[in-house]
Amino acid sequence: MEWSLTQNKLLAYHRLMRTDKPIGALLLLWPTLWALWVASPGVPPLWILAVFVAGVWLMRAAGCVVNDYADRKFDGHVKRTAHRPLPSGDVTEKEARNLFVILVLLSFLLVLTLNVKTILLSVAALALAWMYPFMKRYTHLPQVVLGAAFGWSIPMAFCAVSESLPLSCWLMFFANICWAVAYDTEYAMVDRDDDVKIGVKSTAILFGRHDKLIIGLLQIAVLALLGTVGWLNGLGAFYYAGLAGAGALFIWQQKIIAGRDRDACFRAFLNNNYVGLLVFIGLALSYLKF
């Protein structure tokens, strides 16, 4: 009986950290890898690569915990989130706070193996991760904060590898913000009706009937900014082929969200994993010497 209770609690933590749903970690991982490859160039130090990959998974888990903690009063009123561990009572508020602290401490221990500038930048990463879930109460632009939080690994990666923050770093950072606002608006379109009822704000609500147009413009901005990164760093045809593939996926996303069907919008959101993957493959191939 005791083992059964322990097993149930571990499964609840597993769901709270979303380790059963890796999409969020992947959307955080791809821009991190882009930055490491451009900063290196093409050959990131193995330890730095390992630290950032592990940090992505730990901080994404921490972000999910604090997100559910912030939304614990709202999630019970939304069909998709009503059975999450906090509103269902499978995890207590104290347990969630303790888990968040443990995940952040583990992440910080990893960062301590890097240079001082990167350690200092990690403080901003924690602040952004903590701020994002609460922004939904005060602004219709929480997705911008999410983009900054998901993109902060980019300056950290550049700083860890080269101790510098060149123009390419910031172009990639702003590309990631545009990308995150686009894909998280698709995600928010799934819950838009419920969010309006309970008073949660999002870009999906702010953009209204212009949502598809603005998502499309953001996607164009992503490709333009990443294209400029490629030009500045002398990247070759493989990189631009990757961007072309990403552009084709953006067109497909526009097609399926045309009717604003909830399931279709969620599929469009999930498809962004392949956008990040294609850009990374093109980037990695561009640095290989054939």
UniProtKB/Swiss-Prot annotation:
Compartments, as annotated in UniProt: Cell inner membrane
Keywords for this protein: Cell inner membrane, Cell membrane, Magnesium, Membrane, Transferase, Transmembrane, Transmembrane helix, Ubiquinone biosynthesis
Biological pathway: Cofactor biosynthesis; ubiquinone biosynthesis
Enzyme class: transferase
Spans traversing the lipid bilayer: 33-53, 99-119, 141-161, 213-233, 234-254, 268-288
Any Gene Ontology CC annotation: plasma membrane
CDD domains: PT_UbiA_COQ2 (cd13959)
Co-factor(s): Mg(2+)
EC number in record: 2.5.1.39
Disulfide bond positions: none
Molecular-function annotations in GO: 4-hydroxybenzoate polyprenyltransferase activity
A Gene Ontology BP annotation from the UniProt entry: ubiquinone biosynthetic process
UniProt membrane topology term: Multi-pass membrane protein
Chemical reaction(s) catalysed: all-trans-octaprenyl diphosphate + 4-hydroxybenzoate = 4-hydroxy-3-(all-trans-octaprenyl)benzoate + diphosphate
Classification via PANTHER family: 4-HYDROXYBENZOATE POLYPRENYLTRANSFERASE, MITOCHONDRIAL, PRENYLTRANSFERASES
Stated role: Catalyzes the prenylation of para-hydroxybenzoate (PHB) with an all-trans polyprenyl group. Mediates the second step in the final reaction sequence of ubiquinone-8 (UQ-8) biosynthesis, which is the condensation of the polyisoprenoid side chain with PHB, generating the first membrane-bound Q intermediate 3-octaprenyl-4-hydroxybenzoate.
Family affiliation: Belongs to the UbiA prenyltransferase family.
Name of the protein: 4-hydroxybenzoate octaprenyltransferase
Organism of origin: Cronobacter sakazakii (strain ATCC BAA-894) (Enterobacter sakazakii)
Lineage: Bacteria, Pseudomonadati, Pseudomonadota, Gammaproteobacteria, Enterobacterales
